Every structure is written in C-alpha cells, then in structure tokens.
Amino acid sequence: MMNFDSLKGWLDWQESLHPLAIDLGLVRAARVYQALNPDGNKPLTITVAGTNGKGSCIAYLENIYRAEGYRVGSYSSPHILKYNERIKIDGKPVSDELICQAFARIESVRGDTSLSYFEFGTLTALDIFRRSELDIQLLEVGLGGRLDAVNIVDPDIALISSIGIDHVDWLGATRSSIAQEKAGIFRANTPAIIGDCEPPLSLLQCAVDKSAHLFCINKDFHYQKQTTTWDWFSGNTHISDLPEPGLKGEHQYRNASSAILAVELLAKKLPVSHDSIRLGVKNSQLLGRFQLINDKIPVLLDVGHNP
C-alpha cells in the first residue's frame, strides 16, 4: 500500500497509477466507494453536467446556499492554480492534510482496483464531504455524465446546463449522442433541470425513459430582464429585483436561472429566502471566467476552451 508525506507526492503517483488518463466507467470507482462508504450515507446532492456552464451553475448554487448560512461542499474540475481548488467547503479549498488523509483511506481499501487521476479525486471529494457534516454537496461532472465517476452518487437533483459539441472521441460527434451521455445523471422520480434553450430531442426522451421529473428553461421556468435588474418565474413563484449575475455574459442569466430552480425545488428540505438568492447571484465569482484583473493595465482573463 502506497503512502506519501505530501500532496505533490500523492498526485505524482496517481498520474502514473492508471494506464489511461481518461477511462470512462463506473465499476472501479463504485467498487471503491462502496468500500469507503458501505452505508451509502451522503448529504443532499445536486449533480451538474453540461458542455458549458457547469462551473457557473455550481458557483451560483454554492453562493446562494452559503448566503442562507448552510454548510456547502463543492467539487469541480479542473483546477486553475492548485489542486485543492477542486474540493471546497463553504467556498474555501480544503487543506493538503485533509486531501492526503482521504487519499490514504482510499488507498487502504482499493485493493487491486486501478483508479484514474479523476476517479481518485472524485472519491476523495465524496469521502471528505461525507465526514464534514454538510447540508448539501454540489458535484460537477468531469466528462459526459453516464460513465463519469461523479455518477456513482444518486443526486437529489440533476442539472444539465447546455449541450454542445465537445469530447467527440468519448461522447459522440452529434448533440444528440452527447445529450444521451449527459442524461446519464438523470434518476427516476427526481427533478431533471435543462438549461439549454434548444435541447436535443434525445435529451428530453432520456428524461421520459428514466421517469425523471423534467424542467426546461423557457417552458417550466424563465427569466425576464428589466432595466437594471431581472425577474425569475416558475409556476406561481416569482422572484423580482434580482441583481445582475456576478459572472458576466448573457448566458449567465440562463445558468443563474437553472440554479435558482434547483434551489426552489429543494426548498422543503433546505429553505432559502429570496434575499439569499439575490445575494448569492450577485456575489458569484469563478476563477478564470471573464475574470477582470485590475492592475495598472486591466486584464480580462478567461480560460474556457469552448466558444
């Protein structure tokens, strides 16, 4: 059994542990997760997939729940500067010590099961979150959905932010095939939120086939921009005077709207005031996403690899 004194030591070893950098499938991660967590206990869970907008939706959810005072864990990838950014509790990256302790626990139970770098990280986040008395955990899919390691956890809400052409070697070359892969996060009798304005029919059909409760933007929920604010609507619920999203771009109204619906759908278990929603939307930030760096010369930084 391997053990290392530093986070760098663990990460260097993990990069060489598995023969493939990307190896989709749930069997390996699920086997180790069962050994780590035989009772299957977990916090309330929102899983977010999508070609673009996953990280933004996670950011809105995290900040809304934190504004209400809940204890929130968020898992996302990749990191910008430091590995710890992937695993946050209450908006702060967890320590090297916590990550290394989780790595050691995983190593102690994995036996001869080979894990990819991403699978190790996903299991680490889940293990840390399970031990942290969270009110809710927010999980960002790494690639696709159906066979992504995040999908070993059954979500209480599944959210798909958008469908575009990406990772065609693994997900297929059409929006239809990619949508089917991402729809793998849907569960029976569980809300499935779609933030894409023109979702492929295959995505809608997958929701029906899985008996998920489908909510589509511009049909089941929508937003309306005012002069300096915007309003959100779903059924009989109306949230007025929302501030401009902290993340910039017209598409961020869709992402924020999808996140708000997720919050509203979980309101019986985790009530959130409209004031907290307003504050969370306003305060959301994301490293490397239209990030304005104010120095002597203003710099706009964006690391998104899709248009």
What residue spans do the PLM features occupy?
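Charged, amphipathic alpha-helical linker segments immediately N-terminal to NTP-binding catalytic cores
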Residues: 1-20
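ATP-dependent carboxylate-amine ligase catalytic core
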Residues: 6, 20, 26, 30-34, ...
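A conserved segment at the C-terminal end of the G1
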Residues: 44-48, 56-73
